[in-house]
């Protein structure tokens, strides 16, 4: 019987990693992005991995890029700066890369949920949205979560920023649950954006 509560991982060969839940943000030592919630950790070394970084697949396919075959890499190819095609943030650690097209996806961005719900508003993941983001006010090329009524539009990276800015309200229960006075109250249980036990990088 497989024990998912404790694993061995090539990126941390000296100790096993234990599955834990944290209400405090952590930096993933795999993809180098911030996460919150369930993750694998080594308490001895202060080493953490998102669920999606720990349980990676050698090869994946993504519906937004039907012609691509993404391969898991420990670090970005070449020595040139690269960015994630999902969130548009820099890629500095674990990544899924398509050698044919040159696209890159953080492991957590590759596994983002297609929808987020909080009881009031449902947001759906889109590859391209022409409207500006409800949080930053900018239009962008990154993936976005958008409500069916098109009233709310949030970049994937902005969703993660909102999560980190409000982690105490969301996970500790201090204060109101509303993410922002401008945005809907969305209860993110991301496994980024590691986005996601439902999203957290």
Kindly give the residue locations of the regions a language model identified.
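Cys/His-rich zinc-coordinating "finger" modules and their low-complexity flanking regions
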Residues: 1-201
């Amino acid at each position: 019987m497989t024990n998912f509560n404790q694993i061995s991982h090539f990126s941390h060969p000296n100790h096993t990693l234990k599955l834990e839940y944290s209400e405090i943000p952590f930096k993933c030592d795999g993809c180098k992005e911030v996460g919150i919630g369930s993750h694998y950790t080594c308490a001895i070394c202060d080493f953490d991995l998102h669920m999606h970084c720990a349980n990676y697949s050698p090869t994946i396919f993504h519906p937004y890029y039907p012609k691509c075959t993404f391969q898991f890499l420990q670090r970005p190819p070449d020595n040139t700066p690269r960015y994630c095609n999902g969130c548009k943030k820099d890629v500095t650690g674990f990544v899924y890369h398509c050698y044919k097209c040159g696209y890159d996806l953080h492991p957590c961005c590759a596994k983002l949920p297609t929808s987020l719900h909080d009881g009031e508003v449902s947001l759906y993941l889109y590859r391209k949205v022409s409207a500006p983001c409800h949080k930053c006010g900018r239009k962008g090329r990154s993936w976005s979560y958008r409500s069916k009524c098109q009233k709310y539009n949030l970049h994937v990276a902005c969703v993660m920023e909102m999560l980190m800015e409000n982690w105490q309200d969301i996970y500790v229960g201090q204060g109101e649950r509303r993410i922002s006075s401008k945005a809907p109250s969305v209860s993110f249980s991301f496994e980024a954006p590691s986005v996601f036990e439902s999203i957290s990088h």
